[in-house]
Design a protein with these regions (language model features):
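Cysteine-centered iron-sulfur cluster-binding motifs in ferredoxin-type domains/subunits
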Residues: 105-120, 210-225, 247-250, 280-328
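Hydrophobic alpha-helical transmembrane segments in integral membrane proteins
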Residues: 370-394
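Terminal connector regions
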Residues: 455-490
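Intrinsically disordered, low-complexity Pro/Gly/Ser/Thr-rich segments with frequent PxxP/GP/PP motifs
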Residues: 432-458
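Asparagine-centered strand-capping/turn motif at beta-strand->loop junctions
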Residues: 410-414
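Short, hydrophobic/aromatic beta-strand segments
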Residues: 416-424, 464, 481
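Membrane-embedded alpha-helical bundles of multi-pass integral membrane proteins
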Residues: 1-265, 272-273, 334-366
Length: 490
């Protein structure tokens, strides 16, 4: 992995911060800036890392707090289980989540990316600290890049593999549950080769992500950054460079040279020389506060120059803010040359808190989440579906009666097993034969009972008769489902 300079190529020639002009990988070794925002992010990251690991073990209403059981097609969120038949509920849930993301982005920009996204949290507060601990700072890492593979780098990757294995198990716990994961871990891989293959593949993907692909996930794979052009407006919160305060840039050497030139000009030693000073002398061209030190560039984990304006690659991690504030403090200038602001405010225009999308998005979020809450409150503890039996629609019995075979599918939405009894609702001339009743159905599972409804030929009008099947359990649930029997025409 050959190292290249951390300073970016000119914007007109650069495709991605992680690519050189010839298309080869440009490895980023960002310098850590320990400022006030970094300390806040680090504290939040430690809480999130612990929370991400604990969530699969937490339970609510007797169910996992979050379990995305793809195999059984059941999604449990905050103690509520969504089944494949809950199409409307799932639609409301997803729409509500996306609208909440749109609202958050419109108001606070990409605060999720820089502060709470698992990719950023694990990369910047788990993998990079371990990398710095083993290989050293950004300069030492660049030296290792030039030297090629070394023992330190082998040790780092070995630690990365172990860490990726732990994260893979944590990740899989969200999809298979901690009980199933415990069985995988305590049994030999020979007994469950498919599960072992899933774990090994997930570990490899984790290692590939955090050990090799790294910041390119945010720039190439994640669509969120590309959506910011439509999710943000000129008044959204961003990490921005105050060009009005910082320009024109000038290094310490430029500033010293300008002072020397001015002194020489005033002394008459250099008639007609260009006068540039940092003060407010009449006729002088003053430098801005930016000393063009590049600290904001070498500390950026995605390799951009924030002074070029808002960019897709910026994840609002605030590292450039901490780096710039430290420089401003050293040169005796006020902090905030790079700060949280909006495009309008950075250009000297007044900011507006209330604007259409900031009003419309929360109203839509309240509407959708309110509809979801009402739907969940009125959702029955079981779902009953009556289907026609296989084969002919009806059968003529030797006694002259007509038999209809029905299949009653019962989905138990609760967490405990229930026993369901199937009956005919108030129809004296019909008879129900239900060999499978009461039907036991486990929590979160479904079962189908086959029943027969026997009726005399005289019960049918134009070959049809409407009935109602009543299904109830021992916990007090009861539901009547309409159904139309088929029979011979009179």
């Amino acid at each position: 992995m050959p190292a290249t300079a951390l300073l970016p190529e000119p914007a007109a020639e650069r495709v991605l911060p992680t690519l050189n002009q010839d298309g080869t990988r440009r490895w980023l070794r960002p310098k850590l800036s320990r400022g006030r925002f970094f300390r806040r992010r680090r504290g939040l990251a430690w809480v999130l890392i612990a929370l991400f690991a604990l969530i699969p073990y937490l339970r609510m209403n007797g169910k996992p707090l979050i379990l995305l059981d793809v195999v059984r097609r059941q999604f449990t969120l905050f103690g509520t289980t969504f089944l494949p038949t809950d199409t409307v509920l799932l639609m409301l849930l997803l729409v509500g989540i996306f609208l909440a993301i749109f609202w958050l982005t419109a108001v606070y920009g990409r605060v999720w990316c820089g502060w709470a996204c698992p990719q950023t949290v694990y990369m910047e507060f788990l993998y990079r600290p371990i990398e710095r601990l083993i290989e050293g700072g950004s300069r030492a890492q660049s030296d290792l890049d030039r030297r090629g593979w070394a023992l330190r780098r082998l040790v780092k990757h070995a630690v990365f593999v172990g860490l990726s294995m732990f994260l893979a198990h944590t990740f899989l716990a969200y999809f298979v549950g901690v009980e199933e994961l415990r069985r995988w871990v305590t049994r030999s891989p020979v007994e469950h080769p498919a599960a072992f293959l899933v774990m090994a593949t997930t570990t490899a993907l984790m290692f590939l992500d955090f050990g090799w692909f790294r910041e390119q996930v945010c720039m190439v794979a994640c669509p969120y950054g590309r959506l910011q052009s439509v999710l943000l407006d000129r008044r959204s919160l961003i990490v921005g460079y105050d060009a009005q305060r910082g320009e024109p840039r000038g290094t310490h050497r430029d500033r010293r040279a300008s002072r020397d030139d001015l002194a020489a000009t005033r002394a008459g030693d250099s008639p007609g020389a260009r006068v540039m000073v940092t003060g407010d002398s009449p006729g002088a061209v003053a430098f801005g506060d930016c000393i063009d030190c590049g600290a904001c560039v070498v500390t950026c984990p995605t390799g951009i120059d924030i002074r070029q304006g808002l960019q897709m690659e910026c994840i609002h991690c605030t590292q450039c803010m901490d780096a710039c504030d430290a420089v401003m403090d050293r040169i005796g200038r006020p902090p905030g040359l790079i700060r949280y602001s909006s495009k309008d405010q950075l250009q000297g225009e007044p900011g507006r808190i209330l604007r259409p999308r900031v009003v419309v998005y929360p109203l839509l979020v309240l509407l959708v989440w309110g509809a979801l809450g009402v739907a969940l409150a009125h959702r029955a503890p079981a779902e009953i579906t009556v289907l026609r039996g296989l084969g002919s629609p009806f059968t003529l019995l030797p006694s002259g009666d007509v038999s209809n075979q029905l299949r009653v599918k019962i989905v138990n939405r609760g967490s405990e097993e229930r026993h369901y009894r199937i009956q005919l609702a108030e129809d004296a001339i019909l008879r129900l034969v239900a060999p499978d009743t009461p039907l036991p159905v486990g929590g979160g599972k479904s079962a189908t009972a086959t029943v027969f409804v026997i009726a005399p030929r005289s019960a049918f009008v134009h070959g049809q008769r409407d009935i109602r099947l009543h299904v109830e359990d021992e916990a007090g649930f009861g539901a009547a489902t309409p159904y139309r029997l088929m029979g011979p025409s009179q």
